[in-house]
Amino acid sequence: MLFKKLWRTMGLYKAQFLSMIIMIALGIGIFVGFNMEWYSIDQNTSSFLKETNFADYRLITDEKFSKDELEKVQKIDGVEKAARYFSVNADVKEQEGDSLAMTITEDESVSGFYLVEGADYDPESENGIWLSDKYAAANNISVGDSLTLIYKDTELSGIVQGLIKSGEHMICVRDESQLMPDFKTYGFAYIAPAMYNKAFHRHSDFYEQINIISSKDQSDLLKDVYTTLEKAVLV
């Protein structure tokens, strides 16, 4: 009896039932689609960050970290890798108004990059620049072009050795005032420690950051860092 009544009701309200079925099917399809897309994005992002050796933790100080302090951090139980790191905005001489996040890591296996085109990274290069591929594309810059970065009145002239992507600069904005990336005017570039040393001489040992790769819990790592370095740092 109830079954017959249900069929009678469905017959009277065919359009409404059909609309309801379509809406349910669409809702399920959209939900499954979003979940699949999110899973794909999550997997691709994780793979990219791992491939570019994205740091798990960053120690930051107002002073500088010495090589001895780096070695102490590297010896902390649970720290897989650690490297001194420096990144600062530098003007681009050839592109008025443009800036690049000039980046140096003492160990490319920590906070390094993925090479899209060009030569492999050379830590001993005194004139090599590895440039953001998106900034290069937006400004018609190719491998082999000359580029001059200016930081604190010091010019660093080099040759674009490669075009790259970097997990450390996945969100590439100039400062807090810039909400969205604008690769026409701002990007990033890696230079080797050798180029940094050549340009700044005795001031080239200024690294205000140590980047760490570790699966250790943050609170435990912070406790060990304070005990080891005995100085104020941010993680």
Where are these regions (language model features)?
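Membrane transport/envelope proteins' first extracytoplasmic loop
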Residues: 3-235
